[in-house]
Amino acid sequence: MIKKIILPSLSIFLFTACSLKMPEFSMPSFLSFSDDKDAIALEKANVCQKIEDMDNKLFCYRKIVNENSYAQLRMGTYSVEKKDYKKAIEYLNQSIDNENAYANLALAFLYYKGDGVEKDIDKAFKLLNDSSDIDPNAAYQLSRFYLQGINTKVDVDKGIDLLEFAASKNMLAAQKMLVSIYKDGLFSQEKDAKKVKQWEDIIKKDIRDTNFEVYKL
């Protein structure tokens, strides 16, 4: 379903041992840009992303990392893979300071797991919440908090709203979750054959889910 990416340690963002399965950690087919500067930054970072040789790829990113929030994001996730958490946190915070909402998910993972930082579920929740209206990945992960009452009271309506946002951006995992919810009546929802068919029809279109590309080195 999703290509293997450079950060296997982030491949499954598990908040709980519940049976709800999390998506692989990987970059959005849609990206919300606040201005042309942001789009240009992504374009420059994507030049590096397309380089196959790892040494040359890293050299490319390092040339632009001081000024490019997407390079900071990707070097951050790469540093997590290398277990250089100090550097990862530095890069990810740089990216967030430069208003890149996609870095929130990666940093939230570290705070949730307590990797390189003191474990802080409140911080993880806030980071996801702050980016959930932009990043489908963050919205999907945050839905788990609301559906299961992790660090907040159970709010099924909010959880489903977040799932629907992610699903509308072609996140396959969110689409499948909505099918399960309405087919099996999960989370005290009424079974709804019409909604099941709606999401199954979308899934059948087999549109490639590229919602994780933004994190790929």
What name fits each language-model region?
Residues 1-21:
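Classical Sec-dependent N-terminal signal peptides that target proteins to the secretory pathway
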Residues 18-74, 216:
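N-terminal leader/linker segments that initiate helical-solenoid repeat arrays
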Residues 37, 66-69, 79, 98-100, ...:
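Short helix-capping/linker turns of helical repeat alpha-solenoids
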Residues 60-61, 92, 128, 163, ...:
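Hydrophobic/aromatic packing residues within the alpha-helices of TPR/SEL1-like helical repeat arrays
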Residues 73-81, 106-113, 139-148, 179-184:
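Hydrophobic face of amphipathic alpha-helices that form TPR/SEL1-like repeat modules
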Residues 181-217:
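Terminal, low-structured helical/coil segments at or just beyond the last alpha-helical repeat
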